Curated annotation (Swiss-Prot):
Stretches of the chain forming a coiled coil according to its record: none
Name of the featured protein: Small ribosomal subunit protein uS3
Gene name for this UniProt entry: rpsC
CDD domains: KH-II_30S_S3
Low complexity bias (residue ranges): 238-278
Species of provenance: Mycolicibacterium gilvum (strain PYR-GCK) (Mycobacterium gilvum (strain PYR-GCK))
């Protein structure tokens, strides 16, 4: 299942969070339709901006849209004209006040959506698909937080008559591990032979810190209070069976003979006077 399903949807509530955060009762379908329209509006008008992610939050009378982009200057525009235009379009679409936040992506080589978009742009410019895939993998693996990457291209690769899929992988990409931090991106390249789909999976290590992970990492019985042993000597055990020294006949006989031998050792020998200290 982990090989086929969308990694973000597979890990929702475990290691990933929802991209749209709001509550609705009867307006649920309308809000879903609005979210799709918002994302489509931002995707069609800002292809060159390198948008990695769009997050949407709603309140009763306001909509907050966070745009994560690798080129914030294109989204903002000269003196903020482009940002004002986007905000006006969103307010016209949602009929509510829109708060637009433009956030810069620090490491675009480690974001799966931006890597997929970069490979797709090279395919549209007639670059060989294998060369584009290997170049993207090499640039991503240079980042310190990237542990593994997988890039897949599907379609009429190289103008072939029959479509096929090819992928390259470097490092570890555990798609079925729920605690794994997997970033996933999808983009379509428009070529003269048709569309070529590009998928990218980037593994950035495991996420440990949730309640389930902490409970699993803690040793068994670690939360129990430690019982203190009472002061005094602990009875010695004899043999491998774990019995005490007086629980068997041989042990009892040995303990009875021990005081007699001690008394004989302390008594003076015959014919020798006792010496006392003055």
């Amino acid at each position: 299942m982990g090989q086929k399903i969308n990694p973000h949807g597979f890990r929702l509530g475990i290691t990933t969070d929802w991209k749209s955060r709001w509550y609705a009762d009867k307006q649920y379908a309308d809000y879903i339709k609005e979210d799709v329209a918002i994302r489509k509006l931002l995707a069609t008008g800002l292809e060159r901006a390198g948008i990695a992610d769009v997050e949407i939050e709603r309140t009763r009378d306001r909509v907050r849209v966070d745009i994560h982009t690798a080129r914030p200057g294109i989204v903002i525009g000269r003196r903020g004209t482009e940002a004002d235009r986007i905000r006006a379009d969103l307010e016209k679409l949602t009929k509510k006040q829109v708060q637009l936040n433009i956030l810069e992506v620090k490491n675009p080589e480690s974001r799966a959506q931006l890597v997929a978009q970069g490979v797709a742009e090279q395919l549209s410019n007639r670059v060989a698909f294998r060369r584009a895939m290997r170049k993207a993998i090499q640039s991503a693996m240079r980042q310190p937080n990237v542990k593994g990457i997988r890039v897949q291209c599907s379609g009429r690769l190289g103008g072939a008559e029959m479509s096929r899929s090819e992928f390259y992988r470097e490092g570890r990409v555990p798609l079925h591990t729920l605690r794994a931090d997997i970033d996933y991106g999808l983009y379509e390249a428009k070529t003269t032979f048709g569309r070529i789909g590009v998928k990218v999976w980037i593994y950035k290590g495991d996420i440990v810190g949730g309640k389930r992970e902490l409970a699993a990492a803690a040793p068994a019985g670690a939360d129990r209070p430690r019982r203190e042993r009472p002061s005094g000597t602990r009875p010695r055990r004899s043999g491998a069976s774990g019995t005490t020294a007086t629980s068997t006949d041989a042990g009892r006989a040995a303990t009875e003979e021990a005081p007699a031998t001690d008394a004989a050792a302390t008594a003076p020998a015959a014919g020798q006077p006792e010496t006392t200290e003055s």
